[in-house]
């Protein structure tokens, strides 16, 4: 990965955010690796009341550690919003989200996501990857089929639930400001697909970036028992349905043969 020559003043202020709960096995290496990016990002850990050594290891690795505002789980949406507010307060120009359980993270993941915004002039970059055949069950069985039905313009996205997402501060601010009444930002697992749908509806150019292979510890928890993903599946499903109602897309289901 090559970069154009930039003066110190022209390099954007990048911040990387890891939402995490009980990720002591990977978090220290993940933070250390992210900080090695060409863009020298500051790192924020949003902790969901971990009971292991996640917080201590994150602080040791040099991260800014904040607490998820409410003690509920799953609450990825809450964590992402808290991380964004912290990044806004610290004057970030570009904000990157990464999953905290990745075993094979490299600095180039951050580089690729940020570089897409700078060089390719897209508004949001999202990672996609080669994954184990039994991985990404919610993506394959819920997210992609439902997007194909209600938001066919998004059906080409390989990983609509990607945890590796990057956008400029103004994009994140605008997306958060779109929430209203019955369509507030999801608190849980629906947040990833919500950001994708809202970004696309807003007219932003969203681009997927190939990151190679993804190896993550959460897959080990559900590879033999996919029912452990039921709460995630439920939240993703209802988020897409709610978005379909909001944007008058329910009629699209009539095109599906049943």
Describe each region flagged by the PLM:
Residues 161, 177-186:
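Conserved nucleotide-sugar donor-binding catalytic segment
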Residues 2-151, 166-177, 187-202, 206-209, ...:
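Structured catalytic core of nucleotide-sugar glycosyltransferases
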């Amino acid at each position: 990965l090559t970069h154009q020559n930039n003066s110190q003043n022209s390099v954007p202020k990048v911040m990387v955010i890891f939402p995490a709960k009980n990720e002591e096995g990977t978090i220290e290496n993940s933070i250390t690796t992210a900080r090695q990016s060409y863009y020298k990002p500051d790192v924020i850990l949003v902790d969901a009341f971990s009971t292991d050594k996640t917080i201590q290891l994150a602080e040791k690795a040099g991260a800014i550690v904040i607490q998820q505002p409410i003690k509920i789980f799953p609450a990825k949406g809450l964590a992402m919003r808290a991380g964004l507010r912290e990044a806004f307060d610290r004057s970030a120009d570009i904000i990157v989200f990464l999953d905290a359980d990745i075993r094979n993270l490299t600095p180039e993941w951050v580089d690729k996501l940020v570089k897409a915004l700078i060089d390719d002039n897209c508004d949001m970059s999202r990672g996609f990857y080669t994954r184990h055949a039994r991985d990404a069950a919610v993506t394959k069985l819920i997210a992609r089929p439902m997007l194909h039905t209600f938001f066919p313009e998004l059906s080409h996205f390989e990983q609509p639930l990607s945890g590796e997402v990057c956008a400029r501060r103004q994009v994140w601010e605008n997306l958060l400001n779109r929430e209203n009444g019955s369509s507030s930002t999801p608190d849980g697992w629906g947040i990833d697909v919500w950001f994708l749908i809202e970004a696309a509806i807003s007219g932003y150019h969203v681009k997927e970036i190939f990151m190679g292979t993804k190896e993550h510890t959460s897959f080990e928890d559900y590879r033999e028992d996919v029912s452990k993903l039921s709460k995630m599946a439920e939240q993703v499903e209802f988020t897409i349905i709610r978005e379909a109602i909001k944007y008058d897309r329910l009629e699209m289901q009539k095109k599906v043969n049943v």
